[in-house]
């Protein structure tokens, strides 16, 4: 094993995702409520609003949506209303149905590359950790998905009372793991919530760009977790210096 000791992961859209997909579930629920919404419609609305999610999240008026159930409901219901507005739909019953569906453990599955990647890293001697902005029921979902036991450290914002990008959540993870920042990697799908705050904490970040949204990102980028072992090895060979040239994993 290299100078890297532990690899932390984000959860949503990194390890797990709505199953079969967010647009498919969204369209299915809308259709069940009598609305003519196709998967293509839902996909297009998601694509259009995705770059503005940080701003939309601020518009909800909920500062920490994962801490309390009522705040979670307010936060996500606001976002679902915004998505529906793009489709010309106003239906509070549908908003409630969407919130119920996407708050149900059975609506989620692991990406196909997750277990091979986690087991491969374990076999190489790396410890595994989790740092996620999620309600406390993520803990139960990790057990249901049979990966909870793989993480030596699990930092879930709804349990700990601190959310990304607050640097304290990264320091908490390092403290729990007994790890040094320069010996840690964090993998996530968001530049703002994963890459930038992890780097600010001294952790080596890896951006997981499954949909090819961040081709010009100036850092370590992978398109799937099958590329992660190579990226971690490359990062381990770099000096701990912010001036180090960026790495792009092969195949990304």
Segments (PLM) and residue ranges:
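N-terminal helical cap/lid subdomain that shapes the substrate entry/recognition surface
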Residues: 2-115, 124
């Amino acid at each position: 094993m290299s100078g890297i000791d532990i690899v932390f992961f984000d959860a949503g859209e990194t390890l797990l995702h709505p199953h079969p997909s967010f647009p498919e579930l969204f369209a299915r629920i809308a259709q069940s409520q009598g609305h003519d919404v196709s998967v293509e419609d839902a996909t297009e609305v998601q694509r259009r609003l995705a770059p503005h999610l940080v701003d939309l999240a601020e518009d909800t008026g909920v500062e920490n949506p994962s801490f309390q159930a009522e705040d979670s409901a307010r936060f996500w219901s606001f976002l679902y209303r915004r998505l529906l507005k793009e489709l010309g739909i106003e239906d509070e019953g549908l908003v409630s149905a969407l919130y119920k569906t996407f708050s149900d453990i059975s609506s989620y599955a692991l990406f196909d590359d997750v277990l091979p990647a986690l087991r491969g890293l374990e076999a190489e001697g790396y410890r595994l950790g989790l740092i996620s902005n999620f309600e406390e029921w993520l803990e139960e979902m990790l057990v249901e998905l049979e990966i909870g036991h793989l993480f030596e450290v699990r930092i879930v914002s709804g349990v700990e009372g601190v959310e990304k990008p607050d640097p304290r959540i990264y320091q908490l993870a390092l403290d729990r793991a007994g790890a040094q920042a320069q010996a840690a990697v964090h993998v996530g799908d968001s530049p703002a919530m994963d890459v930038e705050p992890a780097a600010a904490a001294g952790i080596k970040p890896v951006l997981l760009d499954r949909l090819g949204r961040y081709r010009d990102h100036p850092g370590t980028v992978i398109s799937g977790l099958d590329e992660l072992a190579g990226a971690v090895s490359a990062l381990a060979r770099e000096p701990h210096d912010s001036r180090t040239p960026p790495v792009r994993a092969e195949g990304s």
